[in-house]
Amino acid sequence: GLKEWAMKKMCPIAVRLAKKCDGTLATKIKEICDNL
């Protein structure tokens, strides 16, 4: 669906932003994204 597509598009950006401030958060986000 559209939501899943949008999430997949946003994931790399979210991971990049999270990496700048919090590495563990980035890892969590990446795991969630990989499971989409």
From Swiss-Prot:
Keywords assigned by UniProt, alphabetized:
Disulfide bond, Membrane, Secreted, Target cell membrane, Target membrane, Toxin
Answer whether the UniProt record assigns the keyword Secreted to this protein: yes
Tissue expression profile of the protein? Expressed by the venom gland.
Q: Which GO terms describe its molecular function?
A: monoatomic ion channel activity; toxin activity
UniProt entry tagged with the keyword Ribonucleoprotein: no
Listed as disulfide-bonded, the cysteine pairs are C11-C33
Subcellular location per UniProt equals: Secreted; Target cell membrane
- Name the principal localization, coarsely classed: secreted
The cross-references to InterPro entries, in alphabetical order and at most eight, read: Ectatomin_sf (IPR036261)
* An annotated GO cellular component: membrane
**Subunit structure, interactors included:** Heterodimer of subunits A and B; disulfide-linked.
Q: Which family does it belong to?
A: Belongs to the ectatomin family. Ectatomin-Et subfamily.
The protein depicted here goes by the name: U1-ectatotoxin-Et1b subunit B
Q: Which species is listed as the source?
A: Ectatomma tuberculatum
